[in-house]
């Protein structure tokens, strides 16, 4: 299992700004097993992090001659547009890391549900076993004496 800090991919990625002109800003992207960190060009600025628990999907992949354009859709349905060099395949790397994260999370949820229901299961099994088990043999039943018919 990969540690959350293990870098899966690192390199240049461009993010479309939310400003009026929607300029493409170069970022240094660092992809780990639980997030995508975007470092701005200026070294003093803090990175922005897109954690996978807040991402729904990687969508709208379009290829042009030089770039691959894709959109990350967040859980609050915000769309963030990116582009990268065609050969870098950032969109595929992010999509695969997201799927891996979602699979791990689904397994954790499943295991935690099993652990919560596990203490109740032995009690249910004991009740079912008691109902299915034959009762302990009791004393053999004696035939009840029949009254003799009266003769006149």
UniProtKB/Swiss-Prot annotation:
Residues bearing PTM Phosphothreonine: 151
Membrane topology annotation: Peripheral membrane protein
GO BP annotation list: animal organ morphogenesis; apoptotic process; placenta development; positive regulation of apoptotic process; regulation of cell migration; regulation of embryonic development; regulation of gene expression; regulation of glycogen metabolic process
Name of the protein in question: Pleckstrin homology-like domain family A member 2
Listed GO MF terms: phosphatidylinositol phosphate binding
InterPro entries xref list: PH-like_dom_sf, PH_domain, PHLA1/2/3
SMART domains registered for this protein in UniProt: PH (SM00233)
Family: Belongs to the PHLDA2 family.
Region (Disordered): 112-152
Keyword Lipid metabolism: no
Cystine residue pairs: none
Record note on domains: The PH domain binds phosphoinositides with a broad specificity. It may compete with the PH domain of some other proteins, thereby interfering with their binding to phosphatidylinositol 4,5-bisphosphate (PIP2) and phosphatidylinositol 3,4,5-trisphosphate (PIP3).
Record carries keyword rRNA-binding: no
GO cellular component: cytoplasm; membrane
Residue list for modification Phosphoserine: 3, 42, 141, 144
Tissue specificity comment: Expressed in placenta and adult prostate gland. In placenta, it is present in all cells of the villous cytotrophoblast. The protein is absent in cells from hydatidiform moles. Hydatidiform mole is a gestation characterized by abnormal development of both fetus and trophoblast. The majority of hydatidiform moles are associated with an excess of paternal to maternal genomes and are likely to result from the abnormal expression of imprinted genes (at protein level). Expressed at low levels in adult liver and lung, and fetal liver.
CDD domains linked: PH
Signal peptide start and end residues: none
Upregulating conditions: Maternal PHLDA2 allele is activated, while paternal Phlda2 is repressed due to genomic imprinting. Down-regulated by hypoxia. Although highly similar to PHLDA3 protein, it is not regulated by p53/TP53.
Subcellular location: Cytoplasm; Membrane
Keywords: Cytoplasm, Membrane, Phosphoprotein
Additional detail: The PHLDA2 locus is imprinted. Loss of imprinting results in overexpression. Imprinting is dependent on RNAi machinery.
Function summary: Plays a role in regulating placenta growth. May act via its PH domain that competes with other PH domain-containing proteins, thereby preventing their binding to membrane lipids.
């Amino acid at each position: 299992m990969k540690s959350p800090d293990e870098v899966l991919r690192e390199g240049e990625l461009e993010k479309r700004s939310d400003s009026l002109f929607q300029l493409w800003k170069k970022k240094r992207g660092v992809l780990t097993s639980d997030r995508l960190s975007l470092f701005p060009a200026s070294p003093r600025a803090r990175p922005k992090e897109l954690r996978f628990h807040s991402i729904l999907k990687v969508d709208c992949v379009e290829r042009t001659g030089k770039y691959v354009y894709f959109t990350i859709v967040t859980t609050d349905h915000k769309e963030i547009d990116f582009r990268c060099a065609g050969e870098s395949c950032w969109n595929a790397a992010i999509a695969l890391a997201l799927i891996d994260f979602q699979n791990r999370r689904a397994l954790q949820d499943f295991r935690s549900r099993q652990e919560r229901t596990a203490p109740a299961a032995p009690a249910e099994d004991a009740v079912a076993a008691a109902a299915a088990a034959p009762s302990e043999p009791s004393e053999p039943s004696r035939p009840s004496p029949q009254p003799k018919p009266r003769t006149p």
